[in-house]
């Protein structure tokens, strides 16, 4: 979930930061997606782009697939990319061009995937992979430097976009030999190496990848040796590289090739023996056990590992603190004191009271909901969250926390949300605490049934996420209001949002739609909630469509009003940059120690005397990949920074000061690859007089190449004969069933949900994981009702693939033996 802090503006502070400060902004190259449309020489325009334009490339409208992102356009760009690689000598300007080309190409693949279009041709994707391979074998490919690393990261990450890892894996494996104690200091560079493991994870179920590995099983030996040789890295910020090497080796257990599986099983056994639970690096044990549990559970039985007991022991050790609130929350934490837990209870209690008033619930839960208590699980930091949460609770961890509703109709169900702290000081610092708690309350008092029931007919994501954002921010969500200036969405479009859309549309535009409806049409909200509280989600969707059409014009005008009233709007008389503001133009007595917001990816020019101090802060949202602050100029200025507290030259957390005014502070990502979200304060202080010192902030927020918030769990589900299994399929799911001796036939039924809104096809094979292209048995009728009869002659697994080319569905799957 996105995390922003409310920004308070002071007119004087914004009029003039301190005496002696001059401000200038640097215009960016015309590289937004709309700027590229009329370009006569598209590659040349891309080459000079700035990183600030990347998001617009990834969020480009679908129409760009017919021009900027057409196959012909990308084919031409591939030849340009090849030529740029051929003349690459490691210079920063060249590297910047390579990164720009890489990001544009990746954006094209991302937009095409999300639009549901047919993929680009395999020939084009293979040519891109060959270009990447040429780059990775280039003598300057792994040079260290900000621009050079940017090029390496972008091009190596493209492997997963084009899904051609067999053509580049040799070079990517070879690159691991460059990892050492010196190169490990640059975690961005290390993250570029980690793109091998991102690609391996992204190639699950890819038959070409498994055939390649079957012919190159020496790579499994190389990965295990890499992990053993670099155990020292487990004590550093680069530990994720070793961890992922072993984890992705374990995922190869899914391969249909017997030797590949045998080698992967051997490595997992070795890892379990070397890093037992309770030892210093037991997260490697967890990774191995998790992979075996999904793909080779018989090995766990052979080793005598009791998963339930292991989870209980681990939870007791990692989450030793338990505190019951007066309300429904039970707080289990890694490091919260009782006083802090009580403070969290107070926050949740106030949020619950506010919730019931806003949603007008009458304190009555929906029918058949037994989630009377909710566990609030709080890990000490993101690292612990990533290491342990998935094993203990089964959630994904590439996020800022997650609500796990379970089945509310089950009286033995335990609802919980898992979260982590972004700072370990006296403050609570629990990321998304109020947002996730609102999900619990909304599900219990406003939404009948389970999460999949809520989503069955669509047109509800705007409420689920927008309402949680509204309850957290109320009228103070400036990041959402600022988004309006980038182009308005119609209310109908916002209402149609799905979890496959980008985070801005899901959270910020969802917030705007919810706020509009609550402020302008509360009676309509009451009517909608009456439907959702009784499980009438089909009627909800139909009503929402009509409301969108009815209020589109009014919503657009309301957005204009919000924008005019926004303090950051230059037309607002309260904005200090507005010449009509009475506090501007020439404020003779500026506030000397004002702490002023500094926008990400902006520049200031500073001038000051010795011992003068300029104070700023930068808000870093969740899902930020890169963040650094730099000064350069004449004289002697120093840069000091702190996280979550004002920085001064005499009180700071980090500095890289040296003689002169050329300094840079770079913040390293946490284990999940993201910068810790929150407010970063900085001080520019004169050791001597200085002038023309440029202060620059560089922030790369979540690139939309990441998987959508809601995505398929690609871990195979183990089916038992006679037991029905409910599965939600967005694009692809895997299921396996073990057939014992004496069985001659397996009969399998796939039954759609009552709504039967999608089309899920069923594929089966005995010796490998089937795909739509390669299978032994298939049922591909219209809708999601499928049936297979599979003859068997020996014991072993039968593998199934549930595949939806366009719209997925929730299905019930059951199998019987004859």
Curated annotation (Swiss-Prot):
Signal peptide residues on this chain, from the entry's feature table: 1-29
Keyword Amino-acid biosynthesis annotated: no
Cofactor(s) of this protein: Zn(2+)
Record's cofactor remark: Binds 1 zinc ion.
Cellular component aspect of the GO annotation: extracellular region
Keyword Metal-binding: yes
Assigned EC number: 3.4.24.3
Active site as annotated: 436
Stretches for region Disordered: 562-594
Location(s), subcellular: Secreted
Main location as per UniProt: secreted
MF terms in GO: metalloendopeptidase activity; zinc ion binding
Pfam families listed in its UniProt record: Peptidase_M9, Peptidase_M9_N, PPC
Gene Ontology terms describing biological process: collagen catabolic process; proteolysis
Binding site for Zn(2+): 435, 439
Alphabetically ordered keywords of this record: Collagen degradation, Hydrolase, Metal-binding, Metalloprotease, Protease, Secreted, Signal, Zinc, Zymogen
Recorded superkingdom: Bacteria
Reaction(s) catalysed by this chain's protein: Digestion of native collagen in the triple helical region at Xaa-|-Gly bonds. With synthetic peptides, a preference is shown for Gly at P3 and P1', Pro and Ala at P2 and P2', and hydroxyproline, Ala or Arg at P3'
Family: Belongs to the peptidase M9A family.
Function: Possesses gelatinolytic activity.
Protein name: Microbial collagenase
Organism of provenance: Vibrio cholerae serotype O1 (strain ATCC 39315 / El Tor Inaba N16961)
């Amino acid at each position: 979930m996105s995390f922003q802090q409310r920004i308070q503006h002071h007119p004087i502070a914004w009029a003039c930061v301190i005496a002696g400060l001059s401000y200038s902004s640097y215009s960016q190259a015309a590289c937004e997606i709309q700027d590229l449309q009329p370009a006569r020489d598209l590659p040349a325009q891309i080459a000079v782009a700035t990183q600030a334009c990347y998001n617009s490339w990834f969020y480009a409208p679908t129409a760009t697939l017919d021009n900027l992102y057409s196959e012909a356009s990308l084919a031409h760009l591939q030849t340009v990319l090849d030529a740029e690689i051929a003349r690459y000598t490691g210079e920063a300007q060249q590297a910047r061009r390579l990164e720009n080309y890489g990001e544009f190409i990746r954006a094209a693949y991302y937009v095409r995937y999300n639009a549901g279009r047919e993929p680009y041709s395999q020939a084009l994707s293979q040519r891109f992979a060959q270009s990447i391979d040429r780059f990775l074998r280039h003598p300057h490919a792994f040079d260290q430097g900000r621009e050079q690393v940017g090029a390496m990261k972008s091009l190596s990450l493209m492997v997963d976009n084009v899904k051609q890892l067999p053509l580049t894996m040799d070079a990517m494996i070879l690159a691991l030999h460059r990892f050492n104690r010196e190169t490990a200091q640059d975690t961005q560079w290390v993250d570029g190496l980690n793109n091998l493991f991102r690609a391996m994870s992204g190639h699950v179920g890819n038959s070409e990848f498994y055939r390649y590995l079957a012919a190159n099983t020496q790579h499994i030996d190389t990965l295990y040796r890499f992990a053993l040789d670099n155990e020292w890295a487990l004590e550093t910020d680069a530990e994720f590289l070793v961890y992922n090497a072993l984890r992705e080796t374990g995922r190869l257990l899914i391969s249909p090739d017997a030797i590949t599986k045998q080698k992967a099983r051997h490595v997992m056994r070795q890892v379990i023996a070397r890093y037992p639970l309770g030892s210093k690096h037991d997260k490697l044990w967890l990774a191995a056990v998790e992979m075996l549990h999904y793909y080779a559970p018989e090995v766990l039985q052979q080793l005598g590992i009791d998963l339930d007991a292991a989870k209980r022991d681990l939870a007791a050790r990692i989450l030793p603190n338990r505190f019951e609130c007066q309300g429904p929350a039970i707080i289990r934490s890694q490091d919260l004191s009782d006083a802090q837990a009580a403070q969290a209870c107070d926050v949740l209690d106030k949020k619950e009271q506010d919730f019931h008033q806003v949603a007008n619930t009458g304190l009555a839960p929906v029918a058949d909901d037994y989630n009377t208590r909710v566990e609030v699980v709080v890990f000490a930091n993101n690292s612990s969250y990533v290491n342990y949460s998935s094993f203990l609770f089964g959630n994904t961890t590439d996020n800022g926390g997650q609500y796990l509703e379970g089945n509310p109709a089950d009286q033995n169900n335990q609802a919980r949300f898992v979260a982590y702290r972004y700072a370990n000081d006296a403050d609570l610092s629990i990321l998304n605490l109020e947002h996730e708690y609102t999900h619990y309350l909304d599900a219990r008092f406003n939404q009948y049934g389970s999460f999949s029931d809520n989503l069955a007919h669509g047109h509800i994501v705007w409420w689920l996420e927008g309402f949680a954002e509204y309850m957290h921010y109320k009228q103070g969500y400036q990041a959402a209001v600022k988004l309006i200036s980038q182009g308005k969405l119609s209310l109908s479009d916002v209402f149609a949002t799905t979890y496959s859309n980008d985070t801005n549309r899901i959270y910020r535009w969802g917030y705007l739609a919810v706020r509009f409806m609550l402020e302008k049409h509360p009676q309509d909200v009451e009517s909608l909630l009456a439907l959702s509280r009784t499980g009438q989600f089909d009627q909800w969707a139909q009503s929402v469509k009509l409301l969108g059409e009815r209020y589109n014009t009014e919503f657009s005008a309301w957005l204009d009003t919000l924008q005019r009233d926004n303090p950051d709007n230059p037309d607002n008389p309260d904005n200090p940059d507005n010449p009509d503001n009475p506090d501007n133009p020439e404020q003779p007595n500026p506030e000397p120690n004002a702490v002023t917001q500094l926008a990400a990816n902006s520049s200031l020019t500073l001038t000051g005397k010795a011992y003068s101090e300029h104070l700023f802060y930068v808000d870093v949202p969740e899902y930020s990949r890169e963040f650094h602050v730099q000064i350069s100029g004449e004289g002697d200025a120093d840069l000091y920074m702190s996280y979550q507290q004002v920085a001064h030259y005499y009180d700071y957390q980090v500095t890289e000061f040296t003689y002169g005014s050329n300094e840079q502070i770079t913040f390293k990502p946490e284990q999940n690859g993201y910068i810790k979200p929150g407010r970063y304060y900085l001080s520019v202080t004169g050791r001597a007089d200085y002038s023309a010192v440029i202060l620059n902030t560089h922030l790369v927020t979540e690139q939309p190449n990441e998987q959508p918030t809601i995505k398929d769990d690609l871990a195979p589900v183990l089916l038992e004969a006679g037991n029905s299994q409910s599965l939600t399929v967005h694009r692809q799911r895997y299921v396996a069933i073990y057939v014992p001796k004496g069985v001659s036939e397996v009969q399998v039924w796939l039954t759609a949900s009552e709504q039967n809104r999608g089309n899920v096809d069923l594929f089966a094979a005995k010796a490998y994981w089937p795909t739509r292209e390669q299978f032994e048995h298939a049922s591909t009728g219209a809708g999601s009702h499928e049936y297979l009869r599979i003859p068997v002659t020996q014991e072993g697994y039968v593998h199934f693939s549930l595949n939806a080319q366009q719209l997925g569905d929730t299905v019930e799957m059951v199998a019987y033996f004859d």
